[in-house]
């Protein structure tokens, strides 16, 4: 049975009340985790973006160097905003700039021992919170992403 013109928007099926509830629940679950994260990061004396940048440096994909361009992309922020975060982290003793061994023109970012300690503590707390929040997040995602072949909610 095809969808009438009233059942689609731009060729996509209109959302049902159940779809909106699933989206709202997913956003709620994400927001709960982010609220936890903001409090934990603030208690450690950092800003949310600073923690994210440190995590991005430590968690760069294999073969990708921690350059400003890559970090800005990973964080989805502008280059100048990334530089500002790096400057504040460097002033606080959390990160340092290094020259690449194979290309001395290239500047890479690295965590200092202080940055490593703070990141490890925060990441452990975040990992534990995610373990606790995972059932709610997974359930919300399942509501949003019905298995193939399953009838859509109505």
Language-model features: where?
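N-terminal helix-turn-helix DNA-binding core of bacterial DNA-binding proteins
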Residues: 35-78
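Short, structured helix-loop boundary elements
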Residues: 20-23, 47, 68, 127, ...
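N-terminal leader segment of winged-helix/HTH proteins
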Residues: 1-44, 92, 148-154
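Charged, amphipathic alpha-helical coiled-coil/dimerization segments
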Residues: 9-10, 87-145
């Amino acid at each position: 049975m095809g969808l009438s013109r009233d059942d689609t928007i731009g060729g996509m099926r209109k959302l049902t009340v159940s779809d909106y509830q699933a989206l709202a629940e997913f956003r709620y679950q994400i927001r709960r985790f982010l609220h936890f994260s903001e409090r934990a990061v603030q208690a450690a004396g950092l800003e949310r973006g600073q923690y994210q940048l440190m995590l991005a440096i430590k968690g760069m994909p294999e073969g990708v160097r921690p350059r400003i361009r890559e970090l800005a992309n990973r964080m989805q922020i502008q280059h100048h905003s990334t530089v500002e975060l790096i400057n504040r982290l460097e002033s606080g003793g959390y990160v340092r700039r290094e020259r690449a061994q194979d290309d001395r023109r290239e500047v890479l970012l690295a965590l200092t021992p202080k940055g490593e300690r703070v990141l490890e503590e925060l990441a452990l707390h975040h990992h534990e919170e995610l373990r606790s929040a995972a059932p709610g997040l997974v359930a919300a995602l399942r509501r949003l992403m019905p298995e193939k072949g399953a009838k859509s909610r109505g």
